[in-house]
Amino acid sequence: MKILEQRIKKDGRVLGKDVLKVDSFLNHQVDPELMQAMGEEFATIFSDEKIDKIVTVESSGIAPAVFAGLALHVPVVFARKNKSLTLPENVWTADVYSFTKQTTNHIMIDHRFLSAAENILIIDDFLANGQAVEGLLKIANDANANVVGVGVVIEKTFQKGRQILDERGVRVESLARIKGFENDEVIFL
C-alpha cells in the first residue's frame, strides 16, 4: 500500500537493527484518515472471504481493526492484556511474548464474544516474530472459530513470523512489507 509506505518513510523511525517506531500515526498518535484507507484496503483484500468478526490484541491493533470492521460491516473484538474486574471468569486465553516490551502478556477474550463456527479475520499492527498472531490463533482454535486470514499493517519479512504462519497454512496479507533497515532507512520488498 503506497500511501502507508510513504508515511513510514516520512514519519517512521528506525531504532537499532530491527525496531521501527511508528508512534506518530499508528502506535501512540493515530491518523484516522490513514486508518480509514487501511481498513478499506483490508476489506478489498479479504472481500473473497465470509467474515463474521475481526479479532485483534489491545492496544495498537485496535485502530486498524476498527476501521477494517467499519469497512466490512462486522464487529471487532480485542484480546485484553490485563484482567479487569468486569471481565468474567469464562475467557479464552493465551500467553504472548512481546519482543518490543520484553514481557509475556496473558491475553484473554470473553467467551461471549468468540463462538464456534464464526469466521474470524485477525488484524494486527505488526508481524515480526508472530507471537501475537499465534496467541490469537490459539484462542480462535480453543473457541472452535475459523480463522480465514490475518491482515497485518506492517510486516518485517526478515523476522520469522510469516514463516511460522505459512507453515501453519494461514493466509497472511500485509499492507507494507519491510525487507530490512539500512542506514536508518526502511527498505521495502
Curated annotation (Swiss-Prot):
The gene is xpt. Belongs to the purine/pyrimidine phosphoribosyltransferase family. Xpt subfamily. One of its GO terms (biological process) is XMP salvage. Its EC number is 2.4.2.22. GO terms for molecular function: xanthine phosphoribosyltransferase activity. NCBIfam families: PRK09219.1, XPRTase. It is found in: Cytoplasm. This is Xanthine phosphoribosyltransferase. Keywords: Cytoplasm, Glycosyltransferase, Purine salvage, Transferase. One of its GO terms (cellular component) is cytoplasm. 5-phospho-alpha-D-ribose 1-diphosphate binds at residues 128-132. Homodimer. Pathway: Purine metabolism; XMP biosynthesis via salvage pathway; XMP from xanthine: step 1/1. It catalyses: XMP + diphosphate = xanthine + 5-phospho-alpha-D-ribose 1-diphosphate. It comes from the Bacteria. PANTHER family: HYPOXANTHINE/GUANINE PHOSPHORIBOSYLTRANSFERASE, XANTHINE PHOSPHORIBOSYLTRANSFERASE. Converts the preformed base xanthine, a product of nucleic acid breakdown, to xanthosine 5'-monophosphate (XMP), so it can be reused for RNA or DNA synthesis. InterPro entries: PRibTrfase_dom, PRTase-like, Pur/Pyrimidine_PRTase, Xanthine_PRibTrfase. Xanthine binds at residues 20, 27, 156. It comes from Leuconostoc mesenteroides subsp. mesenteroides (strain ATCC 8293 / DSM 20343 / BCRC 11652 / CCM 1803 / JCM 6124 / NCDO 523 / NBRC 100496 / NCIMB 8023 / NCTC 12954 / NRRL B-1118 / 37Y).
